[in-house]
């Protein structure tokens, strides 16, 4: 089934936002840090990166939604 015009625009916007999140992760070395660490909390990842935990948690949420980062909700651990 073909997407409607508005569905196509929403898809483009979502992919654009994801591209920005990937760029942020690359520029801040968050991907490298997460790959080096065992499954970790957002606090641990932010501390290792020297970044504000709130922003790291928001970034992680976007990447979990895109299924790029894995998340275990019970201990609140993130991993690649």
Residue ranges and their predicted role:
Residues 1-80:
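N-terminal accessory segments
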């Amino acid at each position: 089934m073909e997407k409607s015009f508005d569905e196509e625009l929403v898809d483009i916007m979502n992919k654009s936002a994801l591209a920005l999140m990937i760029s942020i992760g690359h520029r801040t070395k968050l991907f490298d840090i997460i790959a080096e660490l065992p499954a970790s909390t957002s606090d641990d990842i932010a501390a290792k990166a020297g970044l504000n935990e709130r922003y790291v948690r928001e970034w992680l949420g976007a990447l979990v939604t895109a299924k790029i980062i894995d998340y275990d909700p019970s201990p609140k651990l993130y991993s690649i």
